Amino acid sequence: MTSDFKVIIVGGSVAGLSLAHCLEKIGVSFMVLEKGNQIAPQLGASIGILPNGGRILDQLGIFHSIEDEIEPLESAMMRYPDGFSFKSQYPQALHTSFGYPVAFLERQRFLQILYDKLKSKDCVFTNKRVVSIASGQDKVTAKTSDGAKYLADIVIGADGVHSIVRSEIWRHLKENSQISVLEAPNASIKHDYSCIYGISLNVPQIILGIQLNCLDDGVSIHLFTGKQSKLFWFVIIKTPQASFAKVEIDNTHTARCICEGLRTKKVSDTLCFEDVWSRCTIFKMTPLEEGVFKHWNYGRLACIGDAIRKMAPNNGQGANMAIEDACSLANILQKKISHGSIRDQDINSMFQEFSMAQRARTESVCAQSEFLVRMHANQGIGRRLLGRYLIPFLYDAPAGLSGFSISGATRIEFIDLPTRSLRGAWGKSWRGSWEFILQSLVYLRPKFRIVYALYLVAAAAFILYCLSSLFP
């Protein structure tokens, strides 16, 4: 390590290990404090790597190891309650446009690769649950449950949606009267859905490279093929507010009852969910939080990843945005260090710059996720009509929606871009709102653009005119 500046990273998962890799590249000293007893536990979860995450991992020299573990997706099949289905080539379109495949692998294996590729493994500590953080004039101290204390210049919370670092930021803001004592820390977070995720083996009638989606009323089922006959899946189900406590307390029993009730759901013409559920090797249920937290930093403390935002897995951007956060923060830190030592006032400006760089994109990607999870569950007449009667006939529209959010992604600015990423689709602006509908036309095949544009404008105008009052 070449810099005297030191960073404590709380949390050794996707965001934390990605930041560790970035800091290692710029020679900044760090330590990762992970509360669990393993860096890569088997929890039954999968992880989706999209081109925006893949490009950064490629810059870090990691993506080739991940590519060895994946079965790239080529197409996706969407099935509706009335039996209608349509096929989208969006995974292949994204691969062609951005140079990286859409792929899924076990989260455990992904974390193990991130750890194995880290040179400074001696800077990663497990069984280190941070319980408090105290800020001094020129340093910050993190105390762990075993009584140990760790000193650094800044602390970065990569510790998930229930972040202790974010809680400490909130505490400091209140103590210094910078927010109202009545302001709730989770006021911007929604709790409308729960997710059951799992892994099944040797499921019949599965074709490699295809994603299967069953979009039903109040529930959606999503299947992704992986290597070694593995099938990664998750079920998103609308959950009454009164049921969330039950999900958290007894999620195994609740998940089992829900999955048993979905046995007869057809996810394709030849496959029922029973075929998947009966071959399940591991599963877990968790409430889904959605939204962007208001406060990301205070003093020498800042958060990244799920500690600043949480979204449903429908758009596959959760882990990829966490990787982007690590990259963005490292870009800013590298610029500061290149101009000499970092002063106290530089730290606050650095975190403010990070917030400005990531917040607009974060809010847009989260808005897309919120829209997709509700459209997939047929929530609201407007979304139901859009999903069933408009999108299936727009050919590459799913590629347009995904490509729009990927195109404006962050990259590591102090490492050259890999050759495979030098494609024309990168760099288009991400403005959010309803502009994604028009922006999606960029990714359609040229000969279809005019026809689809006219059809889209006419159909959208009709739907908005007749049904705008029906949107929640």
Curated annotation (Swiss-Prot):
EC number: 1.-.-.-
Organism of derivation: Epichloe festucae var. lolii (Neotyphodium lolii)
Molecular function as annotated in GO: FAD binding; monooxygenase activity
Family: Belongs to the paxM FAD-dependent monooxygenase family.
Pathway as given in its UniProt record: Secondary metabolite biosynthesis
Cellular localisation: Membrane
Role this protein plays: FAD-dependent monooxygenase; part of the gene cluster that mediates the biosynthesis of lolitrems, indole-diterpene mycotoxins that are potent tremorgens in mammals, and are synthesized by clavicipitaceous fungal endophytes in association with their grass hosts. The geranylgeranyl diphosphate (GGPP) synthase ltmG is proposed to catalyze the first step in lolitremB biosynthesis. LtmG catalyzes a series of iterative condensations of isopentenyl diphosphate (IPP) with dimethylallyl diphosphate (DMAPP), geranyl diphosphate (GPP), and farnesyl diphosphate (FPP), to form GGPP.
Glycosylation sites: 186
Cofactors that this protein relies on: FAD
InterPro entries registered for this protein in UniProt: FAD-bd, FAD/NAD-bd_sf, FAD_mOase_fung
Keywords from the UniProt entry: FAD, Flavoprotein, Glycoprotein, Membrane, Monooxygenase, Oxidoreductase, Transmembrane, Transmembrane helix
Superkingdom of source: Eukaryota
One cellular component term from this protein's GO annotations in UniProt: membrane
Sequence intervals crossing the membrane: 7-27, 450-470
Induction behaviour: Expression is down-regulated when the stress-activated mitogen-activated protein kinase (sakA) is deleted.
Membrane-related topology note: Multi-pass membrane protein
Name this protein carries in UniProt: FAD-dependent monooxygenase ltmM
Chief localization: membrane
Matches recorded under PANTHER family: FAD-BINDING DOMAIN-CONTAINING PROTEIN-RELATED, FAD-DEPENDENT MONOOXYGENASE ASQG-RELATED
